[in-house]
Amino acid sequence: MPNLKDIKSRISSVQNTKKITKAMKMVAAAKVKKAENTVKAARPFSDELLHLFRKMLATVGEYSVAGLHVQRALDNYPELLEKRDIKTEGLLVITSNKGLAGAYNSNIIKTAIARIRANKERGVNTVIYPVGQKAVSAFKHAGKYFELKEGYISIANDPTATGANIIAEDIAEDFVSGHIDKIDIITTHFNNMMSYNVVSWDVLPVKVEQADAHELDPVMEFEPSPHSVLQQLVPMYITNSIYQALLEANASELASRMTAMSAASNNAEEMINTLTIDYNLSLIHI
């Protein structure tokens, strides 16, 4: 049986650990409610933007790049709508900067690695756009079958529309230049405080289903022109898709960390109780 000094030292160590995990749980709990409210408030706008975009594309029809002069890749909407043979796929992989969030980051990274392997098997190259320190670190050591872009670290800490626009411009530039032919986001969908799902959705080329034929919609008129409206709407749609993904990821990460730290605190409490019993038994046998 361990001596009293060793047991007392272990109890003290576990108590210190419990203080840390409990504090981290409280911090995550304080942030996650705000993150939950933000992501849920943003969803109706994203859904309505998608709905509007669907109607516009069905109304406008074909797109021509002739005579279009733009300064930003995001403004080059005809090329952003172009579908071509996929030789290189980009993956925007959204993780957190910190660990101690259960299996949150590892689940996302495993999904991305599986996608890289699937691309390799079908002869498609992969370019990784990592968001968060965990993604940057993981893909630096994950192999050589993909190109790794510079990571977006600060954006993972505080999701904003400005940060989403920075990412959107970078991937739009690579798409328009032909460096990539497609890009998907690998992120999480926040369900509730106890649940999230790792998901993937298309960003470029902009892929919008046509409206159902039986739906009766008013005729759309565009001022000053369809081109000018789409030139504003396409960048908004792409940026908002990325922003929504960042919000979903942030809420999922905080909820996962709160759950993980709650479990760690409970485990620490159980260990303290067990060690306390051992300590008392040792006292009896002295």
State where each predicted segment sits.
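C-terminal beta-strand-loop-alpha-helix "lid" module of Rossmann-like NAD(P)-dependent dehydrogenases
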Residues: M1-I284
